[in-house]
A protein has these predicted regions:
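FAD-binding subdomain of flavoenzyme oxidoreductases
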Residues: 105-107, 117, 121-122, 126-251
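N-terminal flexible segment immediately upstream of the FAD-binding catalytic core
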Residues: 1-60, 77-114
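Glycine-rich, histidine-containing beta strand-loop boundary motifs that form or position
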Residues: 71-75, 82, 98, 117, ...
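Short conserved micro-motifs on helix faces and helix-strand junctions that flank
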Residues: 48, 72, 115, 146-148
Length: 251
């Protein structure tokens, strides 16, 4: 990819999120390019969208130009995946940091939550206090400000037998299909509209109510983990990322 095309893409990103939220200077990018514990590598830009629509527009621009997209939230570096790893990629890399999109919606009287892209375990812990509940992770990740979504995508947790690793079948996410086209997949269990822009705007604005929530048998956690992890004589791995019954969607 030519320098001119990279410069053109940077201009598009600035138009979407503003100059202050598109980082291109080496020194300023360093905190995003290196995980606190694991992973490091160069990106030509770090962009920090302020809402879900900005995030969608950034994804469209980056996918159209064929650059590598690395999604990043708190960047703890606990499991890797939130930074480049080395500098031998075949295409330029852009990091999309989601920490400005940090809202959490409590639904069904606090029985469930919808965490937006940059929501953290810190915030979730505070919101759940009045319901006498705790986040899915309270041992390690909470103490360093890890994100909710990063935990789900990177299979974190599993130390607490009653909760198991982070896992859900209920999510709203973007993916690039086999034809290279970006598409928005709504498996959240909430009727938010028909097109990506409408869906994302309604979600962020909380423009939905109990009638829009679809109650189904989909899981937001592994309800069999506490039994499986006790099967010490089993030859089947108990850990989530080796358990094929829980692989799908964002998990």
């Amino acid at each position: 990819m030519s320098t001119r095309k990279i410069a053109s893409l940077i201009k598009k990103l600035v138009k979407i999120s503003g100059k202050a939220n598109v980082i291109t200077k080496s020194w300023d990018k360093e905190a995003y390019e290196k995980g606190w514990r694991y992973g490091s590598g160069n990106a030509f830009a770090v962009t920090r969208p302020g809402n879900l629509l900005e995030l969608w527009e950034i994804l469209k621009a980056c996918n159209k130009d064929g650059v590598i997209i690395i999604m990043q939230a708190a960047n703890t570096g606990l499991t890797g995946g939130s930074t480049p790893h080395g500098n031998d990629y075949d295409r330029p890399v852009v990091i999309i940091n989601t920490m400005r999109i940090d809202d959490i919606h409590l639904i069904d009287n606090g029985k469930q939550i919808i965490g937006l892209a940059g929501s953290t375990l810190y915030s979730l812990e505070r919101k759940l206090e009045k319901y006498d509940r705790e986040p899915h992770s309270v041992i390690g990740s909470t103490s360093i400000g890890a994100s909710i979504i990063g935990g789900v995508c990177n299979n974190s947790g599993g130390s607490l037998v009653q909760r198991g690793p982070s896992f859900t079948e209920l999510a709203l996410y973007a993916r690039v299909n086999k034809d290279g086209k970006l598409e928005l997949i709504n498996e959240l269990g909430v009727d938010l509209g028909s097109n990506p822009e409408e869906i994302l705007k309604n979600l962020e604005d909380r423009n939905y109510n109990e009638k829009n929530i679809v109650h189904s048998d989909k899981l937001a956690s592994d309800n069999k983990y506490s039994d499986i992890v006790r099967q010490i004589d089993s030859k089947i791995p108990a850990r989530f990322n080796s358990d094929s019954r829980l692989l799908g969607g964002v998990s």
